[in-house]
């Protein structure tokens, strides 16, 4: 048995294939493995869409198969206070938050880690995220790298982690491609081998986003206008729309000036007037940004920067890396200038920075720097 036999790892068991294979791999590596299933949302009795019971059953079946103990914990109160209330406040302010990033920060790598540490006496926690750790020579501080499977890389969602959290966390599937993960699950006859990956915001599930949000925030219908002020439609609430959005405007059949038949996109939200500004064509100047201003800056493995820095940035998940220049304003606020103008830069979302495969950190987009030709 390897030296790992004296190390206890608590695996976040979600009922999905990634956490299932993570638990299997860690056991193969000789660790003392136990599972912990988190319930982060209290569904109503009539909310049939919620899969928590099914996910727990799948997690239990996997743990039984692997002969590991499964603990359960309810973090619904922490989730409501630290994630969901922020989510609502951001939408109420006309911004577009990313609750999955905050869930990782406040729940999976904070509340979960604290419980595993203080109650279960863990040496490490482990998650089924597609990221990797690296320990540079002569430096005990670990870095976070993109997952080997570029299509599944989740470093964008984990940029808020600290060196200390990364050092205490294992990511067994980060070195694997997704098809390999499923192959291992099938070989081990795990019930989750062919289970569909979860998508969307965890507490909304498969239900329509507008229906869910409307339960918590009153909708405020208003006009959809062109940049020139012509009313061309109605929206049901600014919170239901995001910059660069094409679908859901319900003005698709309307021609613009001069018979322009290009599709319509959300170009701007006028919060003061409760008006949605729509523009035609994906190359419209109003959709473009030269850069952004961001706050809540967090570096994974470095002190706050004092000088201008070149790197790449993602302003949304699955986006190609954008070469950029970071100009520090103070320890928590920065200005980012893109090498080339970008579309759909959205306040409330995260700008995450990279040097090659290393995730450097990230920040919350406060406002975009509009294209000077717009």
Curated annotation (Swiss-Prot):
One of its GO terms (molecular function) is tRNA-uridine 2-sulfurtransferase activity. ATP binds at residues 12-19, 38, 128. GO terms for biological process: tRNA wobble position uridine thiolation. It is found in: Cytoplasm. Keywords: ATP-binding, Cytoplasm, Disulfide bond, Nucleotide-binding, RNA-binding, Transferase, tRNA processing, tRNA-binding. It is an enzyme of class 2 (transferase). It catalyses: S-sulfanyl-L-cysteinyl-[protein] + uridine(34) in tRNA + AH2 + ATP = 2-thiouridine(34) in tRNA + L-cysteinyl-[protein] + A + AMP + diphosphate + H(+). The active site is at residues 103, 202. It comes from the Bacteria. GO terms for cellular component: cytoplasm. Belongs to the MnmA/TRMU family. Catalyzes the 2-thiolation of uridine at the wobble position (U34) of tRNA, leading to the formation of s(2)U34. PANTHER family: MITOCHONDRIAL TRNA-SPECIFIC 2-THIOURIDYLASE 1, TRNA 5-METHYLAMINOMETHYL-2-THIOURIDYLATE -METHYLTRANSFERASE. This is tRNA-specific 2-thiouridylase MnmA. It comes from Vibrio campbellii (strain ATCC BAA-1116).
């Amino acid at each position: 048995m390897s030296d790992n036999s004296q190390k206890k790892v608590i695996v976040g068991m979600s009922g999905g294939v990634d956490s299932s294979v993570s638990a299997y791999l860690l056991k193969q590596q000789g660790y003392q493995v136990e599972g912990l299933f988190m319930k982060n949302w209290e569904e109503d009795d009539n909310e049939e869409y919620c899969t928590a019971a099914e996910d727990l059953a799948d997690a239990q079946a996997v743990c039984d198969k692997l002969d590991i103990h499964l603990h359960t914990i309810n973090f619904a109160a922490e989730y409501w206070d630290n994630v969901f209330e922020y989510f609502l406040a951001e939408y109420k302010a006309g911004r577009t938050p990313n609750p999955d990033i905050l869930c990782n920060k406040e729940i999976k790598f904070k509340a979960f880690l604290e419980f595993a540490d203080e109650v279960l006496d863990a040496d490490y926690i482990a998650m089924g995220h597609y990221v990797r750790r690296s320990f540079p020579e002569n430096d005990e501080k670990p870095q976070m790298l993109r997952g080997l499977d570029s299509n599944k890389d989740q470093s964008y969602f984990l940029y808020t982690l600290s060196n200390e959290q990364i050092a205490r966390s294992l990511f067994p599937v980060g070195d694997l491609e997704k098809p390999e993960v499923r192959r291992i699950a099938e070989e081990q006859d795990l019930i989750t081998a062919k289970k569909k990956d979860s998508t969307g915001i965890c507490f909304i599930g498969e239900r329509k986003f507008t229906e869910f949000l409307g339960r918590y925030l009153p909708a405020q219908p208003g006009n959809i206008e062109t940049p020139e002020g012509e009313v061309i439609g109605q929206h049901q609430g600014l919170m239901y729309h995001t910059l660069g959005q094409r679908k859901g405007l319900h003005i698709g059949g309307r021609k613009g000036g001069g018979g322009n038949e290009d599709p319509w996109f959300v170009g701007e939200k006028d919060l003061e007037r409760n008006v949605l500004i729509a523009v035609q064509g994906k190359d419209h100047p109003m959709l473009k940004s030269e850069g952004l201003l961001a706050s809540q800056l967090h570096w994974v493995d470095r002190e706050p920067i004092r000088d201008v820095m070149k790197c790449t940035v993602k302003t949304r998940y699955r986006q190609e890396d954008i070469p950029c220049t970071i100009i520090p304003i103070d320890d928590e606020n920065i200005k980012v200038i893109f090498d080339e103008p970008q579309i759909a830069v959205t306040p409330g979302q995260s700008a995450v920075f990279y040097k090659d495969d290393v995730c450097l950190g990230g920040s919350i987009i406060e406002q975009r720097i509009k294209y000077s030709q717009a």
